[in-house]
Amino acid sequence: MARIIMCGSFKGGVGKTASSWNLAYSLAEMGKRVLAVDFDSQANLTTCFGIEDPAAVPVTIGHLMMNRLEDEEVPDPSEFIQSRNGVDFIPSSMMLSAVDSKLRMEMGSEKMLAGILEPLRELYDYIIVDTCPSLGTLTINALTVADEVIIAVNPQLLAMMGLQDFIRTVKKVRSRLNDRLQIAGILLTMCDARTNLCKVITEQLTETFDGQIRIFKSIIPNTVKVGESIYYSEPLLEYAPENKACKAYRNLAEEVTGDES
Protein backbone atom coordinates (compact mmCIF):
# COMPACT_ATOMS: atom_id res chain seq x y z
CA MET A 1 0.00 0.00 0.00
CA ALA A 2 1.38 3.37 -1.03
CA ARG A 3 2.45 6.11 1.32
CA ILE A 4 0.96 9.32 -0.02
CA ILE A 5 3.39 12.20 0.45
CA MET A 6 2.42 15.75 -0.36
CA CYS A 7 5.19 18.19 -1.20
CA GLY A 8 3.97 21.66 -0.32
CA SER A 9 4.89 25.21 0.55
CA PHE A 10 3.17 28.47 1.35
CA LYS A 11 5.35 30.42 -1.07
CA GLY A 12 6.27 29.88 -4.70
CA GLY A 13 9.80 29.71 -6.02
CA VAL A 14 11.15 27.45 -3.27
CA GLY A 15 12.05 24.45 -5.44
CA LYS A 16 8.98 22.45 -4.45
CA THR A 17 8.18 21.03 -7.88
CA ALA A 18 11.80 20.20 -8.66
CA SER A 19 11.92 18.39 -5.32
CA SER A 20 8.74 16.41 -6.03
CA TRP A 21 10.08 15.40 -9.43
CA ASN A 22 13.57 14.42 -8.35
CA LEU A 23 12.35 12.68 -5.20
CA ALA A 24 10.03 10.56 -7.36
CA TYR A 25 12.93 9.46 -9.58
CA SER A 26 15.24 8.87 -6.62
CA LEU A 27 12.64 6.60 -5.04
CA ALA A 28 12.19 4.77 -8.35
CA GLU A 29 15.96 4.26 -8.53
CA MET A 30 15.66 2.45 -5.19
CA GLY A 31 13.22 0.03 -6.79
CA LYS A 32 10.05 1.66 -5.49
CA ARG A 33 6.86 1.88 -7.53
CA VAL A 34 6.16 5.60 -7.77
CA LEU A 35 3.26 7.74 -8.96
CA ALA A 36 3.72 11.52 -9.17
CA VAL A 37 0.58 13.66 -9.18
CA ASP A 38 0.63 17.21 -10.51
CA PHE A 39 -2.01 18.96 -8.39
CA ASP A 40 -1.18 22.50 -9.48
CA SER A 41 -2.99 24.30 -12.30
CA GLN A 42 0.33 25.82 -13.44
CA ALA A 43 1.26 22.26 -14.51
CA ASN A 44 4.97 22.75 -13.85
CA LEU A 45 5.46 19.12 -12.83
CA THR A 46 3.67 18.04 -16.01
CA THR A 47 6.15 20.13 -18.01
CA CYS A 48 9.04 18.51 -16.12
CA PHE A 49 7.81 15.16 -17.42
CA GLY A 50 8.16 16.46 -20.98
CA ILE A 51 4.59 17.45 -21.84
CA GLU A 52 4.94 20.71 -23.75
CA ASP A 53 1.22 21.51 -24.05
CA PRO A 54 -0.68 20.38 -20.93
CA ALA A 55 -3.92 21.80 -22.36
CA ALA A 56 -3.79 19.16 -25.11
CA VAL A 57 -3.73 16.23 -22.67
CA PRO A 58 -7.13 14.49 -22.95
CA VAL A 59 -7.43 13.45 -19.28
CA THR A 60 -5.69 15.38 -16.50
CA ILE A 61 -6.18 15.57 -12.75
CA GLY A 62 -8.53 18.49 -13.45
CA HIS A 63 -10.79 16.24 -15.53
CA LEU A 64 -10.79 13.60 -12.80
CA MET A 65 -11.68 16.16 -10.14
CA MET A 66 -14.50 17.44 -12.33
CA ASN A 67 -15.77 13.87 -12.67
CA ARG A 68 -15.88 13.64 -8.90
CA LEU A 69 -17.59 17.01 -8.50
CA GLU A 70 -20.30 16.02 -10.96
CA ASP A 71 -20.72 12.56 -9.42
CA GLU A 72 -19.49 10.88 -12.58
CA GLU A 73 -17.39 7.75 -12.71
CA VAL A 74 -13.62 8.21 -12.73
CA PRO A 75 -12.15 6.53 -15.84
CA ASP A 76 -9.84 3.53 -15.72
CA PRO A 77 -6.28 4.41 -14.56
CA SER A 78 -4.93 3.37 -17.96
CA GLU A 79 -6.72 6.41 -19.40
CA PHE A 80 -5.08 9.02 -17.19
CA ILE A 81 -1.80 7.61 -15.82
CA GLN A 82 1.21 8.31 -18.03
CA SER A 83 4.75 7.04 -17.60
CA ARG A 84 8.24 8.32 -18.28
CA ASN A 85 11.49 6.52 -17.56
CA GLY A 86 10.15 4.35 -14.77
CA VAL A 87 7.94 6.88 -13.00
CA ASP A 88 4.18 7.06 -13.51
CA PHE A 89 2.44 10.42 -13.33
CA ILE A 90 -0.94 12.11 -13.57
CA PRO A 91 -0.64 15.38 -15.51
CA SER A 92 -2.37 18.67 -14.78
CA SER A 93 -3.54 21.67 -16.79
CA MET A 94 -5.25 25.03 -16.31
CA MET A 95 -8.54 23.13 -16.03
CA LEU A 96 -7.67 22.62 -12.38
CA SER A 97 -8.30 26.36 -11.85
CA ALA A 98 -11.96 25.88 -12.77
CA VAL A 99 -12.13 22.97 -10.35
CA ASP A 100 -10.67 25.16 -7.61
CA SER A 101 -13.52 27.65 -8.03
CA LYS A 102 -16.16 24.91 -7.90
CA LEU A 103 -14.65 23.27 -4.83
CA ARG A 104 -15.31 26.39 -2.76
CA MET A 105 -19.05 25.97 -3.28
CA GLU A 106 -19.22 22.20 -2.86
CA MET A 107 -20.15 20.47 0.40
CA GLY A 108 -17.58 17.89 1.50
CA SER A 109 -15.19 19.01 -1.22
CA GLU A 110 -12.12 18.29 0.93
CA LYS A 111 -12.19 14.59 0.02
CA MET A 112 -12.53 14.81 -3.76
CA LEU A 113 -8.86 14.01 -4.41
CA ALA A 114 -9.00 11.15 -1.91
CA GLY A 115 -11.65 9.50 -4.07
CA ILE A 116 -9.17 9.46 -6.96
CA LEU A 117 -5.98 8.44 -5.17
CA GLU A 118 -7.18 5.96 -2.55
CA PRO A 119 -8.00 3.26 -5.17
CA LEU A 120 -4.45 3.66 -6.55
CA ARG A 121 -2.67 2.95 -3.26
CA GLU A 122 -2.38 -0.78 -3.90
CA LEU A 123 -0.56 -0.17 -7.21
CA TYR A 124 2.36 1.82 -5.77
CA ASP A 125 4.81 2.14 -2.92
CA TYR A 126 4.83 5.95 -3.00
CA ILE A 127 2.45 8.56 -4.38
CA ILE A 128 4.03 12.03 -4.49
CA VAL A 129 1.57 14.92 -4.76
CA ASP A 130 2.94 18.28 -5.94
CA THR A 131 0.64 21.14 -4.92
CA CYS A 132 0.18 24.83 -5.61
CA PRO A 133 1.96 27.30 -3.30
CA SER A 134 -1.13 28.42 -1.38
CA LEU A 135 -3.48 27.28 1.36
CA GLY A 136 -6.61 27.08 -0.78
CA THR A 137 -9.10 24.28 -1.40
CA LEU A 138 -6.73 22.28 -3.61
CA THR A 139 -4.05 22.19 -0.93
CA ILE A 140 -6.64 21.16 1.67
CA ASN A 141 -7.68 18.30 -0.65
CA ALA A 142 -4.07 17.14 -0.88
CA LEU A 143 -3.58 17.33 2.89
CA THR A 144 -6.79 15.38 3.44
CA VAL A 145 -5.55 12.38 1.43
CA ALA A 146 -1.86 12.55 2.40
CA ASP A 147 -0.17 10.40 5.01
CA GLU A 148 2.71 12.84 5.26
CA VAL A 149 3.73 16.27 4.03
CA ILE A 150 7.19 17.50 3.12
CA ILE A 151 7.42 21.26 3.56
CA ALA A 152 9.87 22.88 1.15
CA VAL A 153 11.54 26.06 2.40
CA ASN A 154 14.34 28.10 0.92
CA PRO A 155 16.60 30.21 3.12
CA GLN A 156 14.76 33.51 2.90
CA LEU A 157 12.94 35.37 5.64
CA LEU A 158 9.66 35.55 3.68
CA ALA A 159 9.66 31.79 3.14
CA MET A 160 10.21 31.32 6.86
CA MET A 161 7.26 33.59 7.68
CA GLY A 162 4.93 31.43 5.59
CA LEU A 163 6.20 28.25 7.23
CA GLN A 164 4.37 28.82 10.52
CA ASP A 165 1.08 29.45 8.67
CA PHE A 166 1.53 26.24 6.71
CA ILE A 167 2.22 24.20 9.84
CA ARG A 168 -0.88 25.62 11.54
CA THR A 169 -2.97 24.56 8.53
CA VAL A 170 -1.51 21.04 8.63
CA LYS A 171 -2.44 20.75 12.31
CA LYS A 172 -6.01 21.92 11.62
CA VAL A 173 -6.44 19.40 8.81
CA ARG A 174 -5.06 16.65 11.06
CA SER A 175 -7.54 17.45 13.84
CA ARG A 176 -10.60 17.97 11.61
CA LEU A 177 -10.20 15.90 8.45
CA ASN A 178 -7.26 13.48 8.45
CA ASP A 179 -5.90 12.09 11.70
CA ARG A 180 -3.22 10.09 9.79
CA LEU A 181 -1.51 13.24 8.56
CA GLN A 182 2.03 13.80 9.77
CA ILE A 183 4.75 16.26 8.85
CA ALA A 184 7.49 14.11 7.31
CA GLY A 185 9.91 16.98 7.65
CA ILE A 186 11.09 20.40 6.55
CA LEU A 187 13.25 20.36 3.43
CA LEU A 188 15.72 23.19 2.90
CA THR A 189 16.03 23.92 -0.82
CA MET A 190 18.01 26.24 -3.10
CA CYS A 191 20.53 26.63 -0.31
CA ASP A 192 24.03 28.00 -0.69
CA ALA A 193 25.82 26.74 2.40
CA ARG A 194 28.54 29.35 1.92
CA THR A 195 26.17 32.26 2.59
CA ASN A 196 25.54 33.60 6.05
CA LEU A 197 21.76 33.70 5.43
CA CYS A 198 21.59 29.97 4.78
CA LYS A 199 23.47 29.27 8.00
CA VAL A 200 21.28 31.64 10.02
CA ILE A 201 18.01 30.20 8.66
CA THR A 202 19.21 26.63 9.24
CA GLU A 203 20.09 27.48 12.84
CA GLN A 204 16.76 29.26 13.31
CA LEU A 205 14.84 26.23 12.01
CA THR A 206 16.75 23.93 14.34
CA GLU A 207 16.15 26.16 17.36
CA THR A 208 12.43 26.58 16.57
CA PHE A 209 11.50 23.00 15.69
CA ASP A 210 14.12 20.78 17.34
CA GLY A 211 12.35 17.82 18.89
CA GLN A 212 9.00 18.80 17.34
CA ILE A 213 9.37 18.61 13.57
CA ARG A 214 12.06 16.75 11.67
CA ILE A 215 14.44 18.84 9.59
CA PHE A 216 15.84 16.69 6.81
CA LYS A 217 19.61 16.28 6.89
CA SER A 218 19.53 16.44 3.10
CA ILE A 219 19.83 20.09 2.12
CA ILE A 220 19.21 20.78 -1.57
CA PRO A 221 21.98 23.07 -2.86
CA ASN A 222 21.45 25.97 -5.21
CA THR A 223 22.85 24.84 -8.57
CA VAL A 224 22.17 25.73 -12.20
CA LYS A 225 21.94 22.03 -13.04
CA VAL A 226 18.48 21.85 -11.45
CA GLY A 227 17.12 24.54 -13.78
CA GLU A 228 18.87 23.02 -16.79
CA SER A 229 17.46 19.57 -16.06
CA ILE A 230 13.94 21.01 -15.89
CA TYR A 231 14.47 22.82 -19.20
CA TYR A 232 15.51 19.56 -20.87
CA SER A 233 12.83 17.52 -19.03
CA GLU A 234 15.50 15.19 -17.67
CA PRO A 235 15.62 14.43 -13.94
CA LEU A 236 18.98 14.99 -12.29
CA LEU A 237 19.59 11.23 -12.15
CA GLU A 238 19.80 11.31 -15.95
CA TYR A 239 21.01 14.84 -16.64
CA ALA A 240 23.69 15.28 -13.98
CA PRO A 241 23.99 12.13 -11.84
CA GLU A 242 27.21 13.29 -10.17
CA ASN A 243 25.88 16.75 -9.32
CA LYS A 244 25.63 17.63 -5.63
CA ALA A 245 21.88 18.33 -5.93
CA CYS A 246 21.31 14.87 -7.40
CA LYS A 247 23.20 13.33 -4.49
CA ALA A 248 21.11 15.39 -2.06
CA TYR A 249 17.87 14.07 -3.59
CA ARG A 250 19.19 10.52 -3.37
CA ASN A 251 19.92 11.12 0.31
CA LEU A 252 16.45 12.60 0.76
CA ALA A 253 14.88 9.46 -0.72
CA GLU A 254 16.86 7.38 1.78
CA GLU A 255 15.63 9.56 4.64
CA VAL A 256 12.03 9.28 3.42
CA THR A 257 12.18 5.49 3.15
CA GLY A 258 14.19 5.06 6.33
CA ASP A 259 17.01 3.40 4.38
CA GLU A 260 19.75 5.74 5.59
CA SER A 261 23.13 4.12 5.82
Identify what each model region corresponds to.
Residues 1-261:
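P-loop NTP-binding core
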